[in-house]
Amino acid sequence: MNVLPCSINTLKGLYEISGVEVGQHFYWQIGGFQVHAQVLITSWVVIAILLGSAAIAVRNPQTIPTDGQNFFEYVLEFIRDVSKTQIGEEEYGPWVPFIGTLFLFIFVSNWSGALLPWRIIQLPHGELAAPTNDINTTVALALPTSVAYFYAGLTKKGLGYFGKYIQPTPILLPINVLEDFTKPLSLSFRLFGNILADELVVVVLVSLVPLVIPIPVMFLGLFTSGIQALIFATLAAAYIGESMEGHH
């Protein structure tokens, strides 16, 4: 019986799992500041993919849309529908670019973790991964969302916006304030946790069963990555709509 070789292979697999590093970062020293290079590099790649795809698809608009133009028109219509549903038919127009930018950046970032061979690029420390695999990125996406819904409420209602904090009774003031300031935390940690967990599960399964098991898990990861992008964009639009309506 080949019990001993199997045991050795199992131990090797467990050893490889223990070598999966989380939180290792590569920094650029710019002036007196340390800049998180991994996030910048992968974010620039994602932005380049988005800009390049859009430029190629719509560089020569046709009355009868081509396949690329048709696809981007469908994406735009989808984003408009999400914004209209959550914000309202009268108010959604100016917010479509913001919601669309969030959705597309998060969607492509999430998918890049599974589809782009980041690990081919060797770094002195750590390794490249999806931008949304890093808490810095998800917090950077959540904070402008918070600014956006405060701006939307103040623009629509002026200082009367803050009256919602004492509705329906002033006793709820601390809870209402806490609710607004925990929204960016829930947005950022939900996205970060799901994407990081997905990539770690794939790494662990690849180290144990390299050929068969990881493939369906990767497809499931692509599906959940798209859902996470939709959830983030939908919640951002819902928060903006809620701030302008003034009720929960």
UniProtKB/Swiss-Prot annotation:
GO terms for molecular function: proton-transporting ATP synthase activity, rotational mechanism. The keyword Transmembrane helix applies. PROSITE patterns: ATPASE_A (PS00449). One of its GO terms (cellular component) is proton-transporting ATP synthase complex. It is found in: Plastid, Chloroplast thylakoid membrane. It is a multi-pass membrane protein. The chain crosses the membrane at residues 38-58, 96-116, 135-155, 200-220, 221-241. The keyword Isomerase does not apply. CDD domains: ATP-synt_Fo_a_6 (cd00310). It holds the Pfam family ATP-synt_A. InterPro entries: ATP_syn_F0_a_bact/chloroplast, ATP_synth_F0_asu, ATP_synth_F0_asu_AS, F0_ATP_A_sf. Keywords: ATP synthesis, CF(0), Chloroplast, Hydrogen ion transport, Ion transport, Membrane, Plastid, Thylakoid, Transmembrane, Transmembrane helix, Transport. Key component of the proton channel; it plays a direct role in the translocation of protons across the membrane. Belongs to the ATPase A chain family. F-type ATPases have 2 components, CF(1) - the catalytic core - and CF(0) - the membrane proton channel. CF(1) has five subunits: alpha(3), beta(3), gamma(1), delta(1), epsilon(1). CF(0) has four main subunits: a, b, b' and c. This is ATP synthase subunit a, chloroplastic. It comes from Nymphaea alba.
